[in-house]
Amino acid sequence: MGRRRGVELYRAPFPLYALRIDPKTGLLIAAGGGGAAKTGIKNGVHFLQLEQISGCLSASLLHSHDTETRATMNLALAGDILAAGQDAQCQLLRFQIHQQKGSKAEKSGSKEQGPRQRKGAAPAEKKSGAEVHPEGVELKVKNLEAVQTDFSTEPLQKVVCFNHDNTLLATGGSDGHVRVWKVPSLEKVLEFKAHEGEIGDLALGPDGKLVTVGWDFKASVWQKDQLVTQLQWQENGPTSSNTPYRYQACRFGQVPDQPGGLRLFTVQIPHKRLRQPPPCYLTAWDSSTFLPLQTRSCGHEVISCLTVSESGTFLGLGTVTGSVAIYIAFSLQRLYYVKEAHGIVVTDVTFLPEKGCGPKLLGPHETALFSVAVDSRCQLHLLPSRRSVPVWLLLLLCVGLIIVTILLLQSAFPGFL
């Protein structure tokens, strides 16, 4: 078997920090930029159309939305609404895609997996907020409400996520406060101090519970603004108290084949860089008791981001050294790994959705993970379907083994039967 490697699907003209996929339209949305510094590097949100062409997954730029002087550092998706973290504010965007009548889709395309530019595509930035391509696909992006979500001395929104029914979104940032907002009005409905120092990540469960992790070494579970419990990993974990760890990321995920079942997954990384770096850890938690169920080492590369597949079957990890890995959620065993796929910090990872356009785009593979990094590249990581022996074949082999055993006994002992 050859060395695994990711496929470069798209290269943007700016560093990429956030990534989402719309299951309904098959749009891959990648965002980033160079920030406010006058370096000539633009800031934007790129909408890419994912397609299967000659059995290979391909991405082509459909629309580029200019975000002026603000780089998008984090994204959340709810239907046709994007919540984009840009500096100290959260900007809501609404995108609409529809096919123009009387146009034919482009049938030809490269057989190679990788970036594809549509014929005659207009320049990336459009002040009108809409682009129409020869294929007749039109995409419009509209700025909705925006609100400041962080108020520290150097304000920065670090994370944003929607609740299960997309009526609320929660934000966290450098000032350690969680703020919850109505969608789409962005009217603030809740605010509380969750951590001393910045919030690293947060996750909203379907029962309204909120999990936050911060640079103060704490991971807390909240019901509205009331502290329910704090995760106790290092007290019961595999590490010594001499090595301080902090929680880097948290995500809720479904339990496959258990309707309504839920798990919480967290990543723990060493707080300090040592000459001989200690391992990072991946932990699964019971979502009702918030007790650890299982912990495994996930290597000595520092983990930068975590995602969970739609069904809760797989976990995706990115590292600060550019590596990408896929783990199976129930056992926390690694199935796929590409060392230094990007060569620089992986800023976000996301799985291809398992509903909507996902199965059609996935083809014969078991899952697909997308990764973006500061190197401006979006990579595709495909996990081949694991071969399994059919039950009927196992039964046939058992019957054959019994018959052979009987024949051997009969030949060795003629009066045996």
Curated annotation (Swiss-Prot):
InterPro entries from the UniProt entry: Quinoprotein_ADH-like_sf (IPR011047), Sec12-like (IPR045260), WD40/YVTN_repeat-like_dom_sf (IPR015943), WD40_rpt (IPR001680)
Residues found modified as 3'-nitrotyrosine: Y10
WD repeat windows: 152-191, 194-232, 298-337
Side Cytoplasmic, residues: 1-388
Keywords per UniProt: Activator, DNA-binding, Endoplasmic reticulum, ER-Golgi transport, Membrane, Nitration, Nucleus, Protein transport, Repeat, Transcription, Transcription regulation, Transmembrane, Transmembrane helix, Transport, WD repeat
Main localization of the protein described in the UniProt heading: endoplasmic reticulum
Keyword DNA damage attached: no
Oligomeric form and interacting partners: Interacts with SAR1B (GDP-bound form). Interacts with MIA2; recruits PREB to endoplasmic reticulum exit sites. Interacts with CIDEB; facilitating loading of SCAP-SREBP into COPII vesicles.
Name this protein carries in UniProt: Guanine nucleotide-exchange factor SEC12
Organism: Rattus norvegicus
